[in-house]
Amino acid sequence: MSVKSKQYFNIFIFIISLIFFDQLSKYLVVKYVKLGSVYFSFFENFFRIIHVRNTGILFSIGSNINYSLKKIFFLAMPIFILIFIFSLSLKEKNRIARISLLLIFSGGVGNVIDRLFRPSGVVDFLDFKFYGIFGLDRWPTFNFADSYVVIGMILFLVYDFFIKRKAFNT
């Protein structure tokens, strides 16, 4: 197997593993946790597993938008953006930047799968107490795909601001 083929194979395994874990966790929540109920909580309600559905995007933004517009803005556009991110990740030479783009891609695909096959909305289940910060008693409920996107974005920003700029300035 050539170096390039091995690299693409590793990328494929990484993406499939992340998407599988995301979809498996959502499947288990749908199967075992009644919609709207708390399955269990840890550390005096600091962290809970709860089954909710999100028909909007980040933090339920746009959940009241017309169904046809949702298909365009929450399905078609993300698919085009994901294709773009994936193509960038294949061209990226820096390992941190590539991993961050692949995390964003995998998280996006995980939520697009929900939008395609779960008309009642994306399954969210990770719920944290937020102690009134920004006026929120609890952080908006999310899933592993959301975590991949956020971690990927943070990694990419760290890469862009610290690593890429440092290399550019030397």
Swiss-Prot record:
One of its GO terms (molecular function) is aspartic-type endopeptidase activity. The gene is lspA. GO terms for biological process: proteolysis. It catalyses: Release of signal peptides from bacterial membrane prolipoproteins. Hydrolyzes -Xaa-Yaa-Zaa-|-(S,diacylglyceryl)Cys-, in which Xaa is hydrophobic (preferably Leu), and Yaa (Ala or Ser) and Zaa (Gly or Ala) have small, neutral side chains. This is Lipoprotein signal peptidase. It is a multi-pass membrane protein. Its EC number is 3.4.23.36. The active site is at D124, D146. It comes from Borreliella afzelii (strain PKo) (Borrelia afzelii). The chain crosses the membrane at residues 9-29, 72-92, 96-118, 143-163.
